[in-house]
Amino acid sequence: MAPERGYTASKDDLLRRLARVEGQVRGVTRMVEEDRYCIDVMTQITAIQAALDKIALGLLDGHARHCLLGEGEGPSEPDEQVRELMGAVGRMLSR
């Protein structure tokens, strides 16, 4: 049996959101193939980035609730837990 993760309870929703993003990326590919207007393509890319940001924030929330406050896997020392979490936040913000 797979270990329980912070997103386990919302896994179906997470998979739906990821499938939607996947469809959006395919749509942008078609737009480029069809030589669509640059601003329209960039608008769709911005929407994809926003959707991914929302997914990532949900994962961070689940991680904080499950792995930091609960009994999830990861570092056992609070300082290491915070360092790990802040590293993930930093990677999100540095793109």
What are these regions (language model features)?
Residues 1-95:
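Solvent-exposed interaction patches of small proteins and small membrane subunits
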